[in-house]
């Protein structure tokens, strides 16, 4: 089954605030790698500690934090940010 991608309000606001080249890079990566994928875990890495249960995807120096909801067949993008600030 193919997964759909949904964005949280936080993720949408972050994308809108980014410069256009970074925003385009991230949106393109999501379109190519997550939309309609059959296994969203292949490109990501499971997080541990306080963020256990979430997944992260690397796009250059940026990270996409997501919740993979198998029961709904949805990848919920929770937040997007620079690798130095996203986990704070």
Model-derived segments and their meaning:
Residues 32-56:
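A short, surface-exposed loop/turn module that caps and links secondary-structure elements
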Residues 17-20, 36:
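Secondary-structure boundary motif
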Residues 2-5, 9, 13-17, 24, ...:
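Enriched for short, Lys/Arg-rich terminal
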């Amino acid at each position: 089954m193919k997964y759909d991608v949904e964005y949280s309000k936080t993720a949408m606001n972050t994308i809108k605030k980014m410069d256009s080249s970074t925003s385009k890079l991230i949106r393109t990566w999501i379109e190519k790698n997550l939309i309609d994928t059959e296994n969203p875990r292949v490109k990501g890495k499971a997080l541990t500690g306080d963020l256990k249960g979430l997944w992260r995807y690397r796009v250059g120096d940026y990270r996409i934090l997501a919740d993979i909801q198998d029961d709904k067949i949805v990848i919920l993008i929770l937040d997007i940010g620079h690798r130095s600030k996203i986990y704070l």
